[in-house]
A protein has these predicted regions:
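Aromatic-acidic/polar surface patches that form glycan- and anion
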Residues: 5-8, 12, 63, 136-143, ...
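N-terminal pre-catalytic "stem/leader" segment of glycosyltransferase-like enzymes
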Residues: 2-34
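Amphipathic alpha-helical segments that form well-ordered structural scaffolds
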Residues: 14, 18, 145-149, 153, ...
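A short, charged/proline- and glycine-enriched loop
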Residues: 1-2, 66
Length: 211
């Protein structure tokens, strides 16, 4: 069993499409609800499932599946917050309280980053887990390289690389945000910055360039 932890804005939707293609009927999503490969809501995990992907903490799932292998993706914390900000402006999920507050109060990027739910979000998903606890860690900035490593590890053939939830207005690898703003966002996410650096140390040389 693979437990794929989808930290928001780390290319988790693109990776989800790939996992669904690879595992087909043996794939399950766990977000607000659990849904099987056909999109049907299920109350329990079917016995055939070999991969679960979604927004959940490692501890919550490892209690039920102690032998499962953890996999996840990490992203530069500042870029991740900026991406979340523009995504919520562009494609709002009105069920989420942060999205409602963003639009109702017309928050700036820094004001959005200062919200409690937006600070150190990556750390909250990973909990007390260390890099050694994960069978695979991908880096969003090197998505194709990380994906190739994942496919090789699990003996899958190459697959087309989808690009889901990408900002169509972003024309370069990084958002054009002032250094002073980046510094403020980094300061609001000190734990995430430390976690990101620690996790990147476990990656291959081709994936840690510019960390």
């Amino acid at each position: 069993m693979l437990l794929s932890i989808h930290i928001p804005k780390t290319a988790g939707v693109s990776f989800r499409r790939i996992l669904a293609q690879l595992y087909q009927e043996d794939f399950l999503l766990k977000y607000w609800q659990m849904t099987d490969a056909r999109g049907q809501v299920v109350s329990t995990v079917p016995l055939n499932v070999r991969c679960i992907h979604g927004h959940f903490s490692p501890e919550s799932m490892l209690q039920a599946y102690p032998q499962a292998k953890l996999i996840t993706w990490v992203r530069d914390p500042v870029e991740r917050v900026i991406s979340s900000y523009y995504h919520r402006l562009r494609d709002p999920d009105w069920q989420h309280p942060v999205t409602r507050e963003l639009h109702e109060k017309k928050l700036s990027l820094v004001e959005f980053a200062a919200l409690d739910l937006m600070r150190n979000e990556m750390s909250r998903y990973l909990g007390t887990r260390q890099p050694k606890d994960f069978a695979f860690i991908g880096r969003t900035e090197c998505f194709e390289t990380s994906l190739a490593r994942f496919l090789q590890m699990y003996n899958f053939n190459q697959v087309p690389v989808p690009r889901e939830n990408c900002n169509p207005q972003r024309t370069s690898a990084y958002y054009p945000v002032a250094a002073s703003v980046r510094g403020k966002i980094a300061a609001l996410n000190e734990r995430d910055v430390a976690v990101y650096e620690e996790y990147c140390q476990s990656l291959t040389e081709s994936e840690v360039v510019s960390v």
